[in-house]
Amino acid sequence: MPVLHNRISNDALKAKMLAESEPRTTISFYKYFHIADPKATRDALYQLFTALNVFGRVYLAHEGINAQISVPASNVETFRAQLYAFDSALDGLRLNIALDDDGKSFWVLRMKVRDRIVADGIDDPHFDASNVGEYLQAAEVNAMLDDPDALFIDMRNHYEYEVGHFENALEIPADTFREQLPKAVEMMQAHKDKKIVMYCTGGIRCEKASAWMKHNGFNKVWHIEGGIIEYARKAREQGLPVRFIGKNFVFDERMGERISDEIIAHCHQCGAPCDSHTNCKNDGCHLLFIQCPVCAEKYKGCCSEICCEESALPPEEQRRRRAGRENGNKIFNKSRGRLNTTLGIPDPTE
């Protein structure tokens, strides 16, 4: 029986990936469709992906599939053909190709079965996730941005919005998608006569969010097909102005794709213009935050003097201090002045 999970250490896999000479292509895709047996589907896809040397993160549930992956350039077309042939629901599926890609986004394949491909917190039995808003293409997005009756709603988390967003887009302040959905309905109650345009990184969150808004009585709802990634690609291909400003946060080692030259965020330590996310180098912290090169040198990649001092301690002493401590996978929320301690290199399903 084939091994259907990874048995090699992360460090060894990362070193192997970095030593590769063949270029890779970072791809994301999703599809809402019924999967009768997610576990069997997961095992079959794992074998298919492994045979093509695909790395990345894939989630499956009864409601569909959500994937962010890295594929050897020479295998991209074979991967596309085999994915399309795997299930009729996947035939012709749009694959979002990364905009700013060094091919080093992933080094291991992780494929998991979950209750939902996006953690939405919805338990309303009458909710119809297929009753989505209308798609918008790049030219239509730009037209909507100039429409005074249109409101753009960013359905990403606060740390994503902080480094980049559409002009005048509204932020729904939250740490997770499940928190955003009820807040979006609440914040838009006074604007039911407006055109609501929802967007996210690759389309998966705003598609479900558009259905949720319609379920809650909003009739004029649109969402951007393929999200920010597909919008920027099509706008560039068609010679249209790209109206997204800043960087598009992505959920892999790159942590961002440059969309425009503007830097709209600031270093969380000194306030200098900066939009580069990093994780605190202290193994007892790993806070996700924005740090400029000057502060990176000053604090040796750490988020504070305390973490800088702790990371310089002998490994055994660091382990002793970490024992029993709630640590790791924190995200700095500057707007709220607090940390969310439940997220990692953030999980795209949250």
Curated annotation (Swiss-Prot):
**Catalytic reaction(s) noted:** uridine(34) in tRNA + AH2 + O2 = 5-hydroxyuridine(34) in tRNA + A + H2O
Q: Which residues form a coiled coil?
A: none
Residues covered by the Rhodanese domain:
146-240
**Do you know which InterPro entries this protein is assigned to?**
Rhodanese-like_dom, Rhodanese-like_dom_sf, Rhodanese_C, TrhO, TRHO_N
Q: Which domain of life is it from?
A: Bacteria
List its EC numbers. 1.14.-.-
The answer to whether the entry has keyword Oxidoreductase is: yes
Matching Pfam families: Rhodanese, Rhodanese_C, UPF0176_N
UniProt xrefs under SUPFAM superfamilies:
Rhodanese/Cell cycle control phosphatase (SSF52821)
Q: Where is the active site?
A: C200 (cysteine persulfide intermediate)
Molecular function GO labels: oxidoreductase activity, acting on paired donors, with incorporation or reduction of molecular oxygen
Q: Which family does it belong to?
A: Belongs to the TrhO family.
Please describe what this protein does.
Catalyzes oxygen-dependent 5-hydroxyuridine (ho5U) modification at position 34 in tRNAs, the first step in 5-carboxymethoxyuridine (cmo5U) biosynthesis. May be part of an alternate pathway, which is able to bypass cmo5U biogenesis in a subset of tRNAs under aerobic conditions.
Task: Name it.
Answer: tRNA uridine(34) hydroxylase
**Name of the coding gene:** trhO
